[in-house]
Amino acid sequence: KISMQIKDVYPEPMQDFPVRLNYEYAHRLIGKEIGAETIKNIATSLEMKIVKEDAEGIDLLVPAYRVDVQRPCDVVEDILRIYGYNNVEIPTQLKSSLTVQGDEDKAYHSQNLVAEQLVGEGFMEILNNSLSKASYYTDFDLNKYPNETTVKVMNPLSADLGVMRQTMLFGGLESVVRNINHKSQNLKFFEVGNTYIYNKEKWSEESPIKAYSQEAHMSLFITGKRVEGSWAHADEQSSIYELKAVVENVLRRVGMPQNNVVIKHSDNNIFSKGVSYETRAGKVLVELGILSLKLKKAFDIEQDVFYADIHWDNLMKAVKKVNLTYTDISKYPSVSRDLALLVDKNVEFAQIEQIAHQTEKKLLKSVVLFDVYEGEHLPEGKKSYAVNFILQDEEKTLNDKQIDAIMKKLIANLTSKLNAELR
């Protein structure tokens, strides 16, 4: 049996909310002057008690059950709702201000555009801790991320959180390993974040903070199969060329013209094979390649991992210098010429491309490498590059005499600077 009636244990009853409403504030927020009597009548009809009133405004007690009305703007909204939005006339003149998008806003906007593009290409975004293991920078002997430039935490929570990351590589690899261990082996990740550098040469007692800097980066990881096999086709493994295509799509998306970029061999020892995308002034925009066997063994990864590091700050600065112009499609035809060049094995295509653009700045539109041959029937220490050159004049049709003169000049410069020979 129930021995007693219901007892309400309520030691601290909810109190009504005190709100001060200023008439001038209400007029400014509504956009129209409403009489004080009208405001008071509406407030009392909404069960708000007027505690005190003066020429400037009223002090109200809002019922405790009205948890959505606790600020002056909430009271004004309730009053306007009863008064009627249709009773507030739209002024004939509206005041507005224009804001100019700054560099940080543009970088953030570009970041979002690229993130949407990567998600559309099958990537998943990851987020790792900016704090990292000190052993990553002491054990691997990294030529681009030496231990001396690591920002160390004075009182770390654990050995795994002892330094600020110099690169986003290790956090990403931890995510890759975690997923592989959970039987998810076909992965495409991207991450946006900052890296942190200490430069002891910039340190001074007057301004020690100058020794520390941070840079924005975007990292990309691809590993596993590109396409799962079925009865219709075999498995297709991911490759460095897939990542290269993704990176070049990113450059296009942010407005970086391909002819403003030079591709060079990367000496970063995190890669077994790698390349870097640089401006013609030598600023690194992207480094990408196949992760070294040493790193894969350290993380107990058996499959190839393809990694790209986009230097976001450098990329945004380079894009800012690009002058985008819109012109009509040329009425005059382009001309294509191919050269088979015999060069030393240590000569890179980027050197040929650079010399070509220096030789002919106006009419040379593109330089493309379409074949590389090393092997029999070539002198020792030599390789063959097959290169395509596109020439075009926007004002007239090029004749054979002009084309031959440009090609002779190109061959002469390639011969003198790279010791190149025609095959």
Residue ranges and their predicted role:
Residues I2-R20, E56-P63, Q93-L98, N128-D141, ...:
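A glycine-rich phosphate-binding loop feature that marks nucleotide/adenosyl-phosphate handling sites
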Residues K1-D8, K32-S45, D74-D78, K133-Y136, ...:
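Conserved alpha/beta core surface patches that mediate binding of polyanionic ligands
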Residues S45-M48, D68, P72, K202-E206, ...:
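A carboxyl-terminal module marker
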Residues K1-V9, V51-D54, I90-P91, E125-N129, ...:
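Flexible, glycine/charged-enriched surface loops at secondary-structure junctions
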Residues V19-Y23, H27-L187, R337, I390-E394, ...:
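Extended, well-folded interaction surfaces typified by the phenylalanyl-tRNA synthetase beta subunit core
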Residues Y23, V62-A64, N155-L157, N194, ...:
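Short, structured patches in soluble enzyme cores that scaffold and shape functional sites
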Residues Q5-R20, K52-A55, Y85-L94, A211, ...:
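Flexible hinge/switch segments at interdomain interfaces of large molecular machines
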Residues K1-Q5, R20-Y23, R28, A36, ...:
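C-terminal effector modules of nucleic-acid-centric enzymes and ribosome-associated factors
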